[in-house]
């Protein structure tokens, strides 16, 4: 059974998601003992530098039309992962992530299910984030949706995954109608992949088959949204946590945020966190 990670890297404005995918791929090569493959999905106009391609397992052109062509926030193609993945077992990631610790042992646990959505995330201190608050997850709470994070989402090529991604496609293409009909207690104004995946799980009635809320260590990520970090009020200036918390980075396996060494897949969110110095350090660790 082949295994690997997958991301979509579509640049938007001055945000270089392809460079983030490169850093993610380097971090996987530097830290994972077994599964370190990363497939990167790009639109037809994206030119992938040769040094990037060397660390990507596969570069896949996003099939059919580019649903995100006219979108500033390039998430509209996120229903296509099932069709783009070259692996039997796949974990979907967000591009703005790095892996400081080895999570290869998670794969055998994840493979017990056909779908497994991350529903618990960590603060920078490694504590369980109290993200069942109203700040980021208001519409999940009000509509009793599973607390899905598509920044770490496992699927296996299977009948259940096929059915799931067919519904995900339908919701993506008709998201306003679905949100209006099936989220009576409030809905986001914009398309959200987390909401779409959660709604598909709810509509199919497969929450027990695809989530394990009481299991907080596998799978999980450190999620650097500012206001789930459980710090004293006023400690963060705004959503850019990097303005308030320092990072101490000498190598990927030991870097610290605010004096706490990172160990879980690290979703840095603030794109300015990934500096050229961090990328250079990753390159030196891999080559």
What residue spans do the PLM features occupy?
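GT-A fold catalytic core of metal-dependent nucleotide-sugar glycosyltransferases
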Residues: 61, 74-127
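Active-site-proximal specificity loops/subdomain of glycosyltransferases
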Residues: 46-85
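A glycosyltransferase accessory/donor-loop signature
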Residues: 1-7, 40, 54-55, 140-152, ...
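Short, polar loop motifs at secondary-structure junctions
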Residues: 42-48, 99-102
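A short, conserved beta-to-alpha structural element at the edge of catalytic cores
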Residues: 117-140, 275, 283-285
